Structures are given as structure tokens and as C-alpha cells.
Amino acid sequence: MAFLEEQVDIVVVGAGHAGVEAALVSARRGHKTLLFTLSPDSISMMACNPNIGGSSKGHLVRELDALGGMMGKVCDQSFLQSRMLNQSKGPAVHSLRAQADKQVYSQNMRHLVENQENLHIRQGEIVSLLCNEEKTEIRGVVSSTGARYYAKAVLICTGVYLNARCIYGEVSEETGPNGLRRATKLSQALLDLGFRLQRFKTGTPARVDRRSLDFSKMEVQKGDVPVVPFSFSTDPATVQIPQEDCYLTYTCEEGHEIIRENIDRSPMYNGVIQGTGPRYCPSIEDKVMKFPEKNRHQIFVEPEGRYTNEMYLSGLSSSLPEDVQMRILRTMAGFEKAEMVRTGYAIEYDCLNSLELENTLETKKISGLYFAGQMNGSSGYEEAAVQGFMAGINAVQKIEGKEPFVLDRSEAYIGVLIDDLVTKENKEPYRMMTSRAEYRLLLRQDNADLRLREKGYALGMVSQEEIKATREKQEAIQKELRRMENTYIGANEENNRILESIPSSPIQSGISLRELCKRPECNYQNIAPLDPERPFLSPFIQEEVEIEIKYEGYIKRQIQQVEAFKKMERKKLPKDICYHDIHNLRLEARQKLDLIRPENMGMASRISGVSPADLSVLLIYLEKEKERRKEEK
């Protein structure tokens, strides 16, 4: 029987947020790329919430944009509302979040993919992988029709579709999200190749018809004015558009009682659901049962699009039966006559144990095979997108015979995310958080371009125009910092009157603008009357200048911490090291080190089960090996 055969450079399996970033990277670097999807209509589909960004996730989107990824640019073309979160806190945790129009976002990303040279979309299900005889090198993929697609690298970005099952109450449907077709055979193919899979779960809330809601009983949540774009390349003037409102309501004790009365019908509590769910995105039934002292929980009511009446209920994820969900809805203020458009559900799916991966997202078992996105046990559109970009760029680097591209924990949230995935055994869907980043004052969302644009340019992902703008921004910041250092104001009556109006204490002698700006009550804006000669600078440059001045001491301290971190990262561990021969290591440490095979002492130090004493043993072993090699020479 004859089957279709085709030769390409790179195959990407799955066209969600990870898959499209990976495929775009490959094609933009000039490689013939085939992007497989179960349905071209679901390219970059936002299957759950209508948000992009948020706490720490906004950092990921901006880092992706700085490297040359597309999520930020497309979000700027598709948003309904934008807010900078955590503005009452320090700049390290400021995070941009946008409500996106789900349909428009997906359409805009599909338009990009369809018009990208070297990139071809193919509808179909991939059921197995082609490898060399030893099962150590990838050769391509096989589709459900028997067609063979040969490639130099293969990227698996299948999201939550592998053996997916959607569950609510007594109903269990063998489908992907929103009733879409699932993938049924690739899991077994991966198991046959020796990969370890695990079963995770996530959930989504009901959607309601906005016409059935009484918004006068809810708190209005407005967007920020002016809007800050996600992409450093977007002209801020183009995103100053009318924004859609979101709303805040609350659950109540009556609704909580309905949940408690029906908890035996919850598939999470009666044993029907086997997968592990995300700790930081609990269902409403989980919140009610685990926090009985709380008599209400916040529910954010968010539009799914400009031209649909569907509203998303953030905070009300549930897999309770349909009738119970409807009863709970109608106990909330403004929801007395609510009509449900879609029922909330939980979805179980297969994913890879991410300890199978190198920090390039290439598998340890099979050269040229990469995994990215929720398939790696992470959660969220943003976590998926950055993994897709990193897997894509590393696949390209490999087939071109170039060095891998890896970001460490001191360089980017992306580095923290991937390092956590490949060194820690994640027993639940991994969510990025600012608290996971040790050097978060250096890894702010506002300076992602200053940190990473040069790297993106070196990779061929950032244009000449974009790098020029970043270099000019960097130069303007440094120039203004020097000017403020060298500009003094005198201790006279007029200047002290201005200081009093801030209010700030008077000065007794001359002081530099930089020193003055360090005062807690002073900022770049309110000292402007004391600085009539200051140049015109964009708000983004002003922000960088102020942060550099106000947090100078903390920034210097973190830079010193990074230097100590880099020292450990530079201590490489031999690839052929046999941990079972290092007898002073504890058994657990030997087993974990042998399983994960860390590249350096820094990675080894972050492995659960490897103690400081084990690290000391490793350091002594490395020194002895160094001396032994010297003697052999």
C-alpha cells in the first residue's frame, strides 16, 4: 500500500501557543517547517481564560517579545482591556495583563502563520515517531493516514489533547477542550519509546450570556489609561482605544451550601478524576471545602470578545454537575437570572515528565526530539509560548550545527521556568510566579528589552529597526542618569518652597538631582520644577531612570548574588560522571543526580533530594578528578 512521503526540515506537532511560536521561529530562520494541527480553526485557540499576562506571566510575554516572539505583538492587536497589576507594590512585581478578544487573537495569529514564508499548515493527527534503529535519533513522524514526514527535528506541542477527557458531574466525554477532537495514539507511541508520562488535570468555568446579567449589582473594573502595550515594538499611540469593562462579584454562603450538599457528585471528590490539578488555580468546590472559614470568594466577570455575549467567570472553575453549576451561579449578586452558555468542566490529559528533558527542551533519550508547552507539565498560554520559542530556536540551532541557546535563572523568567521544569519533579501543573525568581528585581517586565533584545538580534529574531530602538533607549537612560548625577540644585528659598509642596524636607546645602530622587517621597515627575533643563524623555525611559536611582542599593546587591550564582553554574559536571561510584553521596542524591544528569553544580544544587552535604561531596570529587587528570597528562 502506498503512502504519502514528504521531506521537511522541522515538524511541529500541535498549533497552540507553543506550537505557533516554535513553527514561526523555524520558518523565519529559513527552514521548511510543517505545522500539524487537529484543526486549523483552532490555531492559537484560547481554550480557557481570555487573559494574556498577569502576575509573572506578563514578564514572560515581554521577555518573549524582546527575543522576537509574537504573542505580545498579536495581543496588542487583539486586546479588549489592559491593566498593569500590582502597581501599589515595588517594580519587581508589576505585571501587565490584557483581556484578549479570543476569536480575534486566534485569527490574527493564524493570519501570521498562514503568511509566513517556509511555513505550511497540515491538518492531521500524528500517531507515532520515526527514529533510527537504535531509537536515539529522530527521523520524522507518521500521521493517522499512514503518511510519513521525514525531518531533521520534531517538536511535540500537543497541549492538553493527548488522551484528553472532559468531565463534569456524572458526564465524561472523550474529547479535547470545548468538545474538540482529542489525540489518542501518540501517548502510547511515546511510552513505547521509554518516555515517562503523567496524568494532569485542569479546569474551566461556565460561560454566561451577558444579556442575562445585572451589572449594576457588580463592581466595575476599568482598564488603565493610558494603555501600556505588551510589545516593545508597538507604537503606544496605536493601543489607546476604547476598552471593554470587566466586573467583580462574589460567591455567597447560599452558593457554598449548595456546593457542600452536592460535593459527593463532584468528580474531583468521588474519585472519577485521576489527574493532578493546578495548586494555584483551584476549582470553586476546592476553595469552599478547603477554606470553610471564608464566606465569599471573588469572581471576575470578563468579556470573551467584542462581538460575542459570552462572559468568562474567573474564579469559578468547576466540574460539578450542570444543574449544580446553574444553581450556584444564580446565588451571586447580578446573576439572579443568569443563563449559562457553556458548562464548566475539568479536563484530564497525558503529559511528559519534564525530567526527561535537557534545558534546551530536547529529550535526553532521542536527539532532535523536543517538547514544549503544557505537554511538559506546565500551565498557561504564556508558559507554553515561551517554551515553544525556546524549543524552536534550539531545534534550529542544532540542525544548523550552532551552539544551543539557554537562558539561566539570573537572565530571565524564561530561564527560571525551564530550569524548574528540568530539575524539579513537578507533581502538578507548573505555574510561573514572581516568587520563583530569585533575582526578580533584575528581571522586571519593564527592562525585558534591555536584558534580552541583543540576544534576540543575535539569533536573527529581532529586526535592525528594533535593535536600534533598544540601543537608543539604553543610551538615553545612561545619559539621563549621568546628567542627574552631575546636576545640582542650590539650597535657596524658591527650591525649598518647591520641596515643601511635594512635601519633602528642605535642603541645607546643594544636592544632586540623583540624590534628591532617592528620597522616598520624591520621584522623577514631582521634582521636575527643580529641573527646568531636563530633556524630553518617553515615560518608559523615565521609569527606568527612576528605578535605577531608587533601587540602586538593592540592584547592586542582587548583581553580587548573581555573580555567586554564575560561579556555581560555571562548575560543569562531566557528562559521563557515574554518581553511583561516588560513595559518600547519599543514596537519594545518587538516584536523583543520575536521573536528572545536571549540567553543572548550580543545577545540581536545585534538585530536590540533593543536600548541601551532597554538594560538598561533589565539589571534592570534582577537585580530585581535576588533579587526577593533571597527573595523567
Question: Where are these predicted regions, by residue range?
Answer:
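Conserved N-terminal/central alpha/beta ligand/cofactor-binding core
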Residues: Q7, L24-S128, T145, C157-E174, ...
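Extended, charge-enriched "interface" segments that sit outside catalytic cores
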Residues: R436, R453-D614, I620-R628, E632-K633
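A glycine-rich dinucleotide-binding beta-alpha-beta segment and adjacent secondary-structure elements
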Residues: Y312-S378, V406-D419, S538-K592, R597
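Beta1/beta-strand and adjacent pyrophosphate-binding region of the FAD-binding site
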Residues: L4-A18
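Short hydrophobic core segments
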Residues: V13, R148-G159
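An anion/pyrophosphate-binding glycine-rich loop and adjacent beta-alpha core
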Residues: S39-D41, M84, Q188-M326, G334, ...
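Internal hydrophobic alpha-helix adjacent to the cofactor/substrate pocket in enzyme cavities
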Residues: A384-F405
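Conserved beta-strand-loop-beta-strand element in the redox core of flavoprotein oxidoreductases
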Residues: L130-A147
